[in-house]
C-alpha cells in the first residue's frame, strides 16, 4: 500500500475503533450504571431515567413498604393473614400473596388500595412467583408435590408440574423462560422451562432454606445451613448449576429472606427484627434498617423497580408511554398514545384527532353549556376551568360560584378563608390552590405547602399546577420532589475523636481521619480544592486535609483557644470560626497567615457559625448569659439580632441557600426552628424528638441533625419535620454536619484551583469542572488530559478499555478475602425508622452512648467503643495519661486526656502532630536570640550561642564577626526566592522572604526562613524569636522598673511616717491624755525644804523645771547669764518681775504668776511627758527653757530663795491651745 494512503486507512481504523468503543461505553453505561443498586440513585446521573427502588416485605400479618434509606415507611395491608410467600408485578402495579390460613390467593395495588381475592389455593403452599412477561402466577404445593400456574385474575388455573418431591421456594426468570425450585427432603436444586418441560436437577446439597434469583447477573442464590445449627451461608451458581461460590458476609446467621438488586443484597435475619443491606460481592458496606414494631421479624423481602423485572417485547406489542409521548410531536398540541388493538394513534384527553387524521386539536369544553360552570368558563389547551365574577368565589367543587360572605369567626378553622353558604360554612382557597382531603387546608402554588413541590410550583390553571426543579436538580417519579444530579451526596461529620462520612442511605460509612485528632467539634468542606478544614479543640489549632485524609497541614496555631464552630466562604476564599474561650468570632484567609478578630464586643460564648457568601453575611449562635442568634457582615459591621426570645442554648446553625432559610437548634429545649435570613417568619419545626441536638445541615428536601443523647444523625423533611429517620453506628458525639456535593454550596468554581484538573480549558458547570481541549486536540480517556488528534489510539494502555467499562454485575464473584481489620471496614450504619422507640437487640435503651450493640442474629451484647472500658453496666472513658498507656514522649511532651482518646502537647523547643514531638531547629529557622554575628548551635529542645569559639550570652553581639550581607555586586538586595541552589521552576516556592536551597545529600529542596517565620515554605508566622531576642532587654527593663518601684515605696513610707508623727503631735497638743501619775485622791505629799530630789524622782517620772528668761532690756541694762550645765538664768531681774512671783504648776494647769512678794519659792511639779510642751505652748510666760533635775542646783545657785512646794490653786485651768 502506498504510504500516502496510510493516513486515510489509519483515520478509518480510528473511526471504527472509536465508534466501537463508544458503543461499548454507552452499552456499559446503560447496563452498568443504569443498573442502580438499591442505594444508587440512578436519576442523579441524568442518563438513566426511572423511579427510585423501594422494598416490600411481610411482617407478622401485615405487608409494608419502605425506601432503602428508611423513609416512606407505611403499611400496605394491615391484615394479610399468615403469608406463605408473595411477589409483585411491577408493570401492573400489583402485589400478590398467599394466605395459607384462609387458603386464598390475594392481590392489592402497590399503593395499598384495591384489595381483592384472586382464587383459592391449597393449604400447603410453600412458594409463589410471578411471570411478569406472560402475566401468570405460579405457586408450589409442597404436600401434593405440584406446581400450579394461573393468569392474573385466577380464572385459568392448571397444573404445570407434578410428582415432585416436596418442592418449595420457587423462583422464575421469564426472560430466559426458566423456573427454579428446591426440595427440602433431598436438599437439591431443580430447573425447568416455564412450559413445564426440560426438568433438570442442578445440584444436590443440604439444608436449603431460601432461594432467589439475580436476573441481572443470571445467577441462582440460596441459603444453606452449615449443619452445626448455628450458622448459615449464602451460596450461588449459574443457571446451569456451575461456578458455585460462597459469599462472605458479616451477618449470615439464620437468614429468613433475601433479594438482590444491582450490586446489593437485601436480607432479613431471624431474631434480628431488621432488614440488612450489604454489597453482594464483599458483604461489606453494611446498613441495618430497624423496623417498627421491632418485635416482629421481617418475612418475605422484595425490591420494587422496573429493572428488577426487565422486559424484552417490542414497543408495538407493549408500548412505552414515555417513549410514545416523546414521539408524539406530530400530534402537535396533544400527546399521542398508541392503541394496542388498532395500532393507530389516539389523542390525549382534551384533544381530538383532526379531520385529516394527521394531528390532534384542542377540544373547546366551554362551547357546550359552559361544561357545568355556573357563572363563567374559560377554555385552555387540553382543558378548561370555571371562573367567577367579582364578589363571588369558586367553591371547592370547581364549578359553582357563591357570593363572598365571610363566616363569623372562622368557625370551621379553615387554613385560608371561609364562606357562608346555604349548606353552612365552606372553606375556600386562593387562586392557584385547591382544598385538601380534610376540607380545611389548602394545597397549591399559592399555599404554604407550595403545592407539595419541593422547589418550584408552576400554576397551569386554577386548581392545577405542576412541579419543577432548579437547574442541576431532577424531578423524581412522584413529580414533586427534586434530587440533585451528579454524584451521590456524602454526609461529612466530626465524631469528637475522628472525622467520618456516609451516604444519605447509610452506605459508604467510613472514617476519613482518626490519628492525632484529639477533640474535633468544628469542620467544613471546600468544594473548590476538595479539602476538609477542621479545628483541634484540645491542641488549639486549625488544620486542613484532602478528602482522603492525606496532606494534613496546620494553618493557625496561635491566637485561638476553644474552637467550637467553623465555616468556609467558598467564594470569598476565607474561613471563619467561633472561639468561646476568647469570646470572639475570628476570620482568616485559607492559608492561615492573615487572621484577625471579626466580632469581639457584646458577645459571650459563640458556638455555631454559618456563612452566606452571596449575601456576604455571617450568622452565629451565642450560648452565653444572654442566648441569642446574630448576623453581621463579613467584616463584622452591620450587626443584626435574629432571635433572642425563647432561647436557652442555641447551638448549631445552617442555611438553605436555595430558599434563603435559616435553621438552628436549641440543645436544652430540644427544639429545631427556622426563619428567614432577617429573622422574620420564625416558626418551630421539631420539638422533643431530637434529644440533644448539636449541629445541622440541609440539602435537597432533608434537614440533618446530630443528636448527642443517642449518638446518631437524624434526618427529617426540611419543611414539615416529618419522615424522621435516625442513622447511627458506633458514634460518640457527632457534630459539624456538612453535605459534600457540587450543588450543596452553589457558586463554587472548581476551575479556580489548578484549572479544575484540566490540561487545556476548564468550564464550571453546576459546581463541577468540565474539561475542553483546544483546536487540534481531543480529550484523553480520563476526561481531563488532551491528546493530539493524530495520537495513536490503539496503544497498550487503551487496549483493555472494555475491561474498565465492564459492568460491576458482570465481574467475577471469587471468594473475597477477609477484612483488613481497619476500623473503616467494620463500621455499620443503622437506620432507625420514624415512629419507633429506641431499642436494639441488646434491649430497651440500647447500650448507652459509649458502647454499641453487637448481634450475630442469635445473641447480642454491648461492646464498649474504642477508648472506653466497662465500669459496671456502663462504659467509662479510659484515662490513658494516668494509666501511662499513651505514646507521648515524656521528655518532650505532656499527655492530655480526651473523651475516648488522648493527645500529646509538645514542650517548649518541640513541635509535633498530637502524638509525636520533634526538636525545633531554632538556628535554622532563626528562632533564637543569639547576638548579632554570634554562631547558633542547635541542641535537643534548645540551642547554644558561641562567639569565636567561646560561649556568648544570649542577646549579645560578637565584635569580631561580620554579618553576611544580602547585597549583590550591584548593591541591590538579593531575591531570596531566586537562590542559585534551586531551579527556576522553584521561583516563588519559599514565602515571606525565605531562601530556597538544594540539599544534595537528600536530593531535595527546602526553605531557609527569615527570622519570624517557619514551616516547610516559611508560611507560618513565628513570634517566638522576638521574645527570645528581647529577653535580655526585658530583664533589664524589669530590674529598672523594680528599682524605681522600691524607691517610690521608701519615699511613701517616709512620707507616711512623717505624716503620722505630725498628726500625732497635733492631736496630743489638742487633746492631752490623762497623767498616769495622778492619784485618785488628788493629794501629793510634799517634802520639806531639806528633802532631797531623789525621793521625788523615785516616786514619779523625772520632773521638769522651768527657768524664766527675761528679754534683754537695753534701758535697764540687764543681760542674761549662763547657769551651770548650760542653764540660763536672769542675772538682772526687772523690778516689776521677781523670781518668786512665778509658780511652776502641774502640767494640767497654766503657769500662775503672783505679784511681788518677799517669800520667793519654786515648786517642782510631778513629771509628765508633756510637761514642757504644755508650758512651752503657754503665752503667759515671756520666755522659758525646760531643764531637768540635773540643772536644778544650778537654778537654785542663781536664785537661792527657790524651794519646792505644792500648789494651792483655787481652780484648774485648761491648757492653752
Curated annotation (Swiss-Prot):
User: Can you tell me which residues are glycosylated?
Assistant: 111, 410, 810, 944
LDL-receptor class B repeats by residue range = 93-134, 135-176, 177-219, 489-529, 530-572, 573-615, 616-659, 660-702
GO cellular component labels: extracellular exosome; extracellular region; extracellular space; plasma membrane
Question: Hey, which stretches end up on the Cytoplasmic side?
Answer: 1059-1217
PROSITE patterns attached to this UniProt entry: ASX_HYDROXYL, EGF_1, EGF_2, EGF_3, EGF_CA, LDLRB
Tell me the disulfide pairings in this chain: 366-377, 373-386, 388-401, 407-418, 414-427, 429-442, 445-457, 453-467, 469-482, 751-762, 758-771, 773-786, 842-853, 847-862, 864-875, 881-895, 888-904, 906-917, 923-936, 930-945, 947-958, 982-996, 990-1007, 1009-1018
Q: What is this protein called?
A: Pro-epidermal growth factor
Amino acid at each position: 500500500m502506498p504510504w500516502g494512503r496510510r493516513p486515510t486507512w489509519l483515520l478509518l481504523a480510528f473511526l471504527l475503533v472509536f465508534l466501537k468503543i463508544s458503543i461499548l461505553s454507552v452499552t456499559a453505561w446503560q447496563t452498568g450504571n443504569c443498573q442502580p443498586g438499591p442505594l444508587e440513585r440512578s436519576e442523579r446521573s441524568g442518563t438513566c431515567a426511572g423511579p427510585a427502588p423501594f422494598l416490600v416485605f411481610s411482617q407478622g400479618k401485615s405487608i409494608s413498604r419502605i425506601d432503602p434509606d428508611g423513609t416512606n415507611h407505611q403499611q400496605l395491608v394491615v391484615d394479610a393473614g399468615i403469608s406463605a410467600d408473595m411477589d409483585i408485578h411491577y408493570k401492573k402495579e400489583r402485589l400478590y400473596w398467599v394466605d395459607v390460613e384462609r387458603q386464598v390467593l390475594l392481590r392489592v395495588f402497590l399503593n395499598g388500595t384495591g384489595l381483592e381475592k384472586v382464587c383459592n389455593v391449597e393449604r400447603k403452599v410453600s412458594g409463589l412467583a410471578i411471570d411478569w412477561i406472560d402475566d401468570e402466577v405460579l405457586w408450589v404445593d409442597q404436600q401434593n408435590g405440584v406446581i400450579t400456574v394461573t393468569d392474573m385474575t385466577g380464572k385459568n388455573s392448571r397444573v404445570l408440574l407434578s410428582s415432585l418431591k416436596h418442592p418449595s421456594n420457587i423462583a422464575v426468570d421469564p426472560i430466559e423462560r426458566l423456573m427454579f425450585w428446591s426440595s427440602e427432603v433431598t436438599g437439591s436444586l431443580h430447573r425447568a422451562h416455564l412450559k413445564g418441560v426440560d426438568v433438570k436437577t442442578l445440584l444436590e446439597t443440604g439444608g436449603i432454606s431460601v432461594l432467589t434469583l439475580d436476573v441481572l447477573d443470571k445467577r441462582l442464590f440460596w441459603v444453606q445451613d452449615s449443619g452445626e445449627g448455628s450458622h448459615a451461608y449464602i451460596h450461588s451458581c449459574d443457571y446451569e448449576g456451575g461456578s458455585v461460590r460462597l459469599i462472605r458476609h458479616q451477618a449470615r446467621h439464620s437468614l429468613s429472606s433475601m433479594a438482590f438488586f444491582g450490586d446489593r443484597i437485601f436480607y432479613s435475619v431471624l431474631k434480628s427484627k431488621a432488614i440488612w443491606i450489604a454489597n453482594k460481592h464483599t458483604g461489606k458496606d453494611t446498613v441495618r434498617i430497624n423496623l417498627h414494631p421491632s418485635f416482629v421479624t421481617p418475612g418475605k423481602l422484595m425490591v420494587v423497580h422496573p429493572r428488577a423485572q426487565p422486559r424484552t417485547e417490542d414497543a408495538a406489542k407493549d408500548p412505552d408511554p414515555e417513549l410514545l409521548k416523546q414521539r408524539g410531536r406530530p400530534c402537535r398540541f396533544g400527546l399521542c398514545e398508541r392503541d394496542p388493538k388498532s395500532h393507530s394513534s389516539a389523542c390525549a384527553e382534551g384533544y381530538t384527532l383532526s379531520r385529516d387524521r394527521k394531528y390532534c386539536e384542542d377540544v373547546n369544553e366551554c362551547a357546550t353549556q359552559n361544561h357545568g360552570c355556573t357563572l363563567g368558563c374559560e377554555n385552555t389547551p387540553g382543558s378548561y376551568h370555571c371562573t367567577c365574577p367579582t364578589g363571588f368565589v369558586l367553591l371547592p367543587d370547581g364549578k359553582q360560584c357563591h357570593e363572598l360572605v365571610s363566616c363569623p369567626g372562622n368557625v370551621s378553622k379553615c387554613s385560608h378563608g371561609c364562606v357562608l353558604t346555604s349548606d353552612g360554612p365552606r372553606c375556600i382557597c386562593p387562586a392557584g390552590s385547591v382544598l385538601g382531603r380534610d376540607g380545611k387546608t389548602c394545597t397549591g402554588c399559592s399555599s404554604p405547602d407550595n403545592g407539595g413541590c419541593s422547589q418550584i410550583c408552576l400554576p397551569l390553571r386554577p386548581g392545577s399546577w405542576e412541579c419543577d426543579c432548579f437547574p442541576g436538580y431532577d424531578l423524581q417519579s412522584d413529580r414533586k420532589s427534586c434530587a440533585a444530579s451528579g454524584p451521590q451526596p456524602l454526609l461529612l461529620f466530626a465524631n469528637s475523636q475522628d472525622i467520618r462520612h456516609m451516604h444519605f442511605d447509610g452506605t459508604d460509612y467510613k472514617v476519613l481521619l482518626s490519628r492525632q485528632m484529639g477533640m474535633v467539634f468544628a469542620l467544613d468542606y471546600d468544594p473548590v480544592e476538595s479539602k476538609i478544614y477542621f479545628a483541634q479543640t484540645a491542641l488549639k489549632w486549625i488544620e486542613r486535609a484532602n478528602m482522603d485524609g492525606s496532606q494534613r497541614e496546620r494553618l493557625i496555631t496561635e491566637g485561638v483557644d476553644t474552637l467550637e464552630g467553623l465555616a468556609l466562604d467558598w467564594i470569598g476564599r476565607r474561613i471563619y470560626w467561633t472561639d468561646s474561650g476568647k469570646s470572639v468570632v475570628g476570620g482568616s484567609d485559607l492559608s492561615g497567615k492573615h487572621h484577625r478578630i471579626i466580632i469581639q464586643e457584646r458577645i459571650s460564648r459563640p458556638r455555631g457559625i454559618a456563612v452566606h457568601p452571596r449575601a456576604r453575611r455571617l450568622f452565629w449562635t451565642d450560648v452565653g448569659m444572654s442566648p441569642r442568634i446574630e448576623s453581621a457582615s463579613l467584616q463584622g459591621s452591620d450587626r443584626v439580632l435574629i432571635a433572642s426570645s425563647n432561647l436557652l442554648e442555641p447551638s448549631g446553625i445552617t442555611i438553605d441557600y436555595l430558599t434563603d432559610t435559616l435553621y438552628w437548634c436549641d440543645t436544652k429545649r430540644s427544639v429545631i426552628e427556622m426563619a428567614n435570613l432577617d429573622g422574620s417568619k420564625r416558626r418551630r419545626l421539631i420539638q422533643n424528638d431530637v434529644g440533644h441536638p448539636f449541629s445541622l445541615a440541609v440539602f435537597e428536601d432533608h434537614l440533618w441533625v446530630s443528636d448527642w443523647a443517642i449518638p446518631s444523625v437524624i434526618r427529617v423533611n426540611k419543611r414539615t419535620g416529618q419522615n424522621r429517620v435516625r442513622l447511627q453506628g458506633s458514634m460518640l458525639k457527632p457534630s459539624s454536619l456538612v453535605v459534600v456535593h457540587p450543588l450543596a454550596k452553589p457558586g463554587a468554581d472548581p476551575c479556580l484551583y489548578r484549572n479544575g484538573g484540566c490540561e487545556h480549558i476548564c468550564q464550571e458547570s453546576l459546581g463541577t469542572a468540565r474539561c475542553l481541549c483546544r483546536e487540534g486536540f481531543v480529550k484523553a480517556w480520563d476526561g481531563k488530559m488532551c491528546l493530539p488528534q493524530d495520537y495513536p489510539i490503539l496503544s497498550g494502555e487503551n487496549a483493555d478499555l472494555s475491561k474498565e467499562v465492564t459492568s460491576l454485575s458482570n465481574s467475577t464473584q471469587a471468594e473475597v478475602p477477609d477484612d483488613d481489620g481497619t476500623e473503616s471496614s467494620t463500621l455499620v450504619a443503622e437506620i432507625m425508622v420514624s415512629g419507633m422507640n429506641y431499642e436494639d437487640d441488646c434491649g430497651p435503651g440500647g447500650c448507652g452512648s459509649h458502647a454499641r450493640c453487637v448481634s450475630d442474629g442469635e445473641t447480642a451484647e454491648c461492646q464498649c467503643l474504642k477508648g472506653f472500658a466497662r465500669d459496671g453496666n456502663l462504659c467509662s472513658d479510659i484515662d490513658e495519661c494516668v494509666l501511662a498507656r499513651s505514646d507521648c514522649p515524656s521528655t518532650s511532651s505532656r499527655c492530655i486526656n480526651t473523651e475516648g482518646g488522648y493527645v500529646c502537647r509538645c514542650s517548649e523547643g518541640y513541635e509535633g502532630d498530637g502524638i509525636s514531638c520533634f526538636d525545633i531547629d531554632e538556628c535554622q529557622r532563626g528562632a533564637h536570640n543569639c547576638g548579632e554575628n554570634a554562631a547558633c548551635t542547635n541542641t535537643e529542645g534548645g540551642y547554644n550561642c558561641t562567639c569565636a569559639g567561646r560561649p556568648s550570652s544570649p542577646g549579645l553581639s560578637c565584635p569580631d564577626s561580620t554579618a553576611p550581607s544580602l547585597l549583590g555586586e550591584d548593591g541591590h538586595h538579593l531575591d531570596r526566592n531566586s537562590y542559585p541552589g534551586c531551579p527556576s521552576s522553584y521561583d516563588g516556592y519559599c514565602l515571606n522572604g525565605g531562601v530556597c536551597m538544594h540539599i544534595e545529600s537528600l536530593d531535595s529542596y527546602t526553605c531557609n526562613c527569615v527570622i519570624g517565620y517557619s514551616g516547610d515554605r516559611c508560611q507560618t508566622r513565628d513570634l517566638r524569636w522576638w521574645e527570645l531576642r528581647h529577653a535580655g532587654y526585658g530583664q533589664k527593663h524589669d530590674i529598672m522598673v523594680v528599682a524605681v518601684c522600691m524607691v517610690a515605696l521608701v519615699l511613701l513610707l517616709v512620707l507616711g511616717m512623717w505624716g503620722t508623727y505630725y498628726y500625732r503631735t497635733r492631736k496630743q497638743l489638742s487633746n492631752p491624755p490623762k497623767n498616769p501619775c495622778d492619784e485618785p485622791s488628788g493629794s501629793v505629799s510634799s517634802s520639806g525644804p531639806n528633802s532631797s530630789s531623789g525621793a521625788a524622782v523615785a516616786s514619779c517620772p523625772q520632773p521638769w523645771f522651768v527657768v524664766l528668761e527675761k528679754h534683754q532690756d537695753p534701758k535697764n541694762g540687764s543681760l542674761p547669764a549662763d547657769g551651770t550645765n548650760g542653764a540660763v538664768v536672769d542675772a538682772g531681774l526687772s523690778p516689776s518681775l521677781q523670781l518668786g512671783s512665778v509658780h511652776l504648776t502641774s502640767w494640767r494647769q497654766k503657769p500662775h504668776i503672783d505679784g511681788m512678794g518677799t517669800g520667793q519659792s519654786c515648786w517642782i511639779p510631778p513629771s509628765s511627758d508633756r510637761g514642757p510642751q504644755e508650758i512651752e505652748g503657754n503665752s503667759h510666760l515671756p520666755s522659758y527653757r525646760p531643764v531637768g533635775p540635773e540643772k536644778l542646783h544650778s537654778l537654785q545657785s542663781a536664785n537661792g530663795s527657790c524651794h519646792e512646794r505644792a500648789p494651792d490653786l483655787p481652780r484648774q485651768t485648761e491648757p492653752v491651745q
